[in-house]
């Protein structure tokens, strides 16, 4: 499904929070939406592997990486795993790498930047926790919609027709 965040903001102005314009699109899908699962980790993506092995149909993994762009939390291998398990998208408050490969995958990926250095894989972090970045507080179960214009968040799913 294609999402237009500008149109959704016009229709649901009172019901959505708009994330500050910090993110760029790195995935093969220009727009995506779904229910989020939150993760908080810093320069370590081990927990992301565990979560992305689950079925992700209708879901988005939202990762608070502390805004660090020193190490990439998502690479092509991790994004392929997410695609294979039908995740709608990844929102990374941090960095990604192997961007040429990422843009070939049928998944939405929004992140702050790209860097060639990979993350540690020790599994340090927490999931299903409240996270805050870009002027918005995110909870697992919220609904997120993203496109090349921006990212918006709603407590409830928006009626898209």
Swiss-Prot record:
It holds the Pfam family RraA-like. Keywords: Cytoplasm. GO terms for molecular function: endoribonuclease inhibitor activity; enzyme binding. NCBIfam families: NOT-MenG, PRK09372.1, RraA_entero. HAMAP family: RraA. Globally modulates RNA abundance by binding to RNase E (Rne) and regulating its endonucleolytic activity. Can modulate Rne action in a substrate-dependent manner by altering the composition of the degradosome. Modulates RNA-binding and helicase activities of the degradosome. Belongs to the RraA family. This is Regulator of ribonuclease activity A. The gene is rraA.
């Amino acid at each position: 499904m294609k999402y237009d965040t500008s149109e959704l903001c016009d229709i649901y102005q009172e019901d959505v929070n708009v994330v500050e314009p910090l993110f760029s699109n790195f995935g093969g899908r220009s727009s995506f939406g779904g229910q989020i699962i939150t993760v908080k980790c810093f320069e370590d993506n081990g927990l992301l592997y565990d979560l992305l092995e689950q079925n992700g149909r209708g879901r988005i993994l939202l990762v608070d990486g502390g805004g660090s762009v020193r190490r990439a939390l998502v690479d092509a291998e991790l994004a392929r795993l997410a695609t294979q398990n039908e995740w709608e998208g990844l929102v990374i408050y941090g960095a990604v790498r192997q961007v040429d490969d990422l843009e070939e995958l049928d998944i939405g990926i929004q992140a702050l930047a790209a860097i060639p250095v990979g993350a540690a894989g020790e599994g340090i972090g927490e999931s299903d926790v409240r996270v805050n970045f870009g002027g918005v507080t995110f909870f697992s179960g919220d609904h997120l919609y993203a496109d090349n214009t921006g990212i918006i968040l709603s407590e409830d799913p928006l009626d898209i027709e």
